[in-house]
Design a protein with these regions (language model features):
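Substrate-binding/catalytic cleft of secreted carbohydrate-active enzymes
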Residues: 1-60
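Short, P/G- and charge-enriched loop/turn segments at secondary-structure junctions
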Residues: 17, 198-200
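Aromatic- and carboxylate-lined catalytic core of secreted/periplasmic carbohydrate-active enzymes
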Residues: 25-28, 37-39, 54-188, 200-231
Length: 232
């Protein structure tokens, strides 16, 4: 049959999650094999660029915010259990136990901690949270929300407009969440309506953050909190 993925959308794994979520009857969705950290873009040509931690984060947050119930992480060396004296495919040379120190591997826990900080089973994907025009490819913002909280993942740090009226509460508290280290930065309290945001670090690919907005009557996150608690 025809190739099911439109040209130039191969990296947009949020599209595949949305497509699966729209099927009837609805079933749980997960991206079972996204990219692998430190594997070549073209897979078989080890001279191509390697997928890095920022790519791993993009695939993970896009997928989960679009509706996946979890995420699958992979590493080129770990999946092959590369070690001295044992050759591997796809240009893998790093021993698997050294790969356990790679950044993408160690940053996945920050996504888990974020998701489990808020009511998990009421959370839904909701792109109507994004007001105005959304971006294409890496500039696309992906939104998810519960009844009294919302989150928007922004991979490039581009300016975006967010509609606070999509959740409960006349007043809202907002934070930036850094996906690289799980750090929180309180932005302030806001009235309802549409508000424009851009992280102070500016625009660049891989400069990714999550905007968190919460009904001010809720205390999922404290204003003076600088790190979301670990959820085992």
């Amino acid at each position: 049959g025809d190739y099911p993925i439109e040209e130039n959308t191969e990296e947009d794994n949020w599209r595949f999650v949305e497509r699966s979520m729209a099927m009837k009857p609805m079933k749980p969705v997960i991206d079972g094999e996204p990219i692998y950290e430190e594997i070549p873009h073209g897979l078989h040509d080890e001279n191509e660029l390697l997928w890095k931690d920022y790519d791993v984060r993009r695939y993970a947050y896009w997928s989960v915010f679009a509706g996946s119930f979890g995420h699958t992480y992979g590493h080129n060396s770990i999946m092959q259990f590369i070690k001295p004296g044992v050759g591997g495919a796809y240009g893998a040379k790093k021993p698997w136990y050294d790969a356990l120190n790679d950044p993408g591997y160690n940053q996945m826990k920050y996504l888990k901690n974020l998701m489990l900080t808020f009511p998990f089973f009421e959370r839904v994907p909701d792109q109507s949270v994004i007001a105005g025009q959304n971006g294409e490819r890496y500039d696309r913002a992906i939104a998810t929300r519960g009844n009294d909280y919302l989150m928007v993942y922004n991979y490039t740090g581009r300016p975006m407009e967010v509609d606070f009226s999509k959740i409960s509460g006349a007043k809202k508290n907002a934070w930036w969440y850094t996906t690289k280290d799980g750090k929180l930065e309180y932005i302030g309290e806001f009235d309802n309506g549409v508000h424009k945001f851009q992280h102070d670090s500016g625009y660049s690919s891989g400069n990714d953050h999550v905007l968190i907005v919460v009904d001010s009557s809720k205390d999922y996150v404290k204003k003076d909190c600088y790190q979301i608690n670990t959820h085992e």
